[in-house]
């Protein structure tokens, strides 16, 4: 997502991430791309569960648009860690959206999932609740425009099943599938961020 935003030549790009290594890696990649452009990249460590930090960040940088993609998205992991999934995916979204309104952010885009449609697992349910939070905020204020996009299976993203399948094949199998009758649809990372 950030690599695509860079191509739009923003005034500044604020990267807000809880994972130090992930933040370091993306900041380095974007800094290399940014040699062709002239805008600032700010790598900021933090959690969407720290509302005070979010509000301060949005106000300090006069943020115009938020792309909220912070989520726990590995279905089995969220099933095993339900409380953390709820805390991050639901309350993190609530904090981020409320901070956006309080800070006068114009646009807020939630990155959601196709698993939020008639959810059958905790991760899908938490993302559906996150969508409902934005819908409620949209009806009760006119400061921030909220929208959301549901991604399906994104090839080679951090949540993709493809690396797991590759590993299982290299190791001689078996390839684990949840349901032999299921049909999976995939999109590339580029296709996903262009939505």
Language-model features and meaning:
Residues 43, 85, 108, 146-149:
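Hydrophobic/aromatic anchor residues within beta-strands of the central parallel beta-sheet
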Residues 10-11, 58, 62-67, 75, ...:
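Proline-aspartate-enriched helix->loop->beta-strand connector
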Residues 19-22:
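Helix N-cap at the beta1-alpha1 junction of Rossmann-like dinucleotide-binding domains, i.e.
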Residues 68, 72-131, 136:
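Conserved Rossmann-fold NAD(P)-dependent oxidoreductase catalytic core, especially the SDR/UDP-sugar
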Residues 44-45, 87, 179:
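Conserved residues in the N-terminal Rossmann fold of short-chain dehydrogenase/reductase
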Residues 42-65:
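Conserved Rossmann-fold cofactor-binding substructure of NAD(P)-dependent oxidoreductases
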Residues 31, 98-101, 122-195:
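NAD(P)-dependent short-chain dehydrogenase/reductase
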Residues 4-5:
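Aromatic pocket-lining residues of Rossmann-like dinucleotide-binding sites
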């Amino acid at each position: 997502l950030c690599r695509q935003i860079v191509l739009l030549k923003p005034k500044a790009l604020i990267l807000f991430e809880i994972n130090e290594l992930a933040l370091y890696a993306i900041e380095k990649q974007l800094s290399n791309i940014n040699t062709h452009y002239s805008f600032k990249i700010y790598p900021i460590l933090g959690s969407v569960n720290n509302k005070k930090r979010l509000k301060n960040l949005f106000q300090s940088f006069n943020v115009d648009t938020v792309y909220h993609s912070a989520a726990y998205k590995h279905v089995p992991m969220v099933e095993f860690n339900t409380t953390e999934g709820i805390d991050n995916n639901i309350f993190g979204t609530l904090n981020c959206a409320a901070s956006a309104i309080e800070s006068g952010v114009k646009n807020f885009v939630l990155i959601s999932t196709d698993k939020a449609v008639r959810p059958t697992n905790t991760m899908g349910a938490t993302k559906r609740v996150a969508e409902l939070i934005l819908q409620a905020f949209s009806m009760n204020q006119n400061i921030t425009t909220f929208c959301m996009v549901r991604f399906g299976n994104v090839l080679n993203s951090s949540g993709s099943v493809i690396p797991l399948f590759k590993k299982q094949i290299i190791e001689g199998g078996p390839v684990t599938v949840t349901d032999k009758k299921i049909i999976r649809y995939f999109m590339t990372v580029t296709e996903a961020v262009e939505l």
